[in-house]
């Protein structure tokens, strides 16, 4: 049931390096269970390789920032027709940021696209869309393409009152 899903924090080992006071980058190993739809001749098996997310963030003097990210993941499943463990590689890229264009007003945004990354997109996480059955090859799964994004404005009227409007 989609409404009973919960977002869980994933085990992760991450290294972040500050190149300057404005530029930082991070590289991680993250264990994310893929969520996929099994076909008639495919079966879930334990995952063996962690996801590899990377991020680069540039911060501006006024509190604004721009961040680019990417993830590479290998997802395992069992092809029961050929009795083989198979790997499908997924990938994703994102661009996000906050633009502080007035003292108390900011614009935030994010866009993401990839294949096999449904667990990284909140609205479709856990819905079986990392891998889906390949309609032209029994016993095979393929990475499902997904995209998402949002844009929003925030205004601080005072220290205790803020208004936000978002579109996703």
Predicted regions and their residues:
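Glycine-/small-residue-rich "gating" segment that lines the acyl/pantetheine channel
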Residues: 14
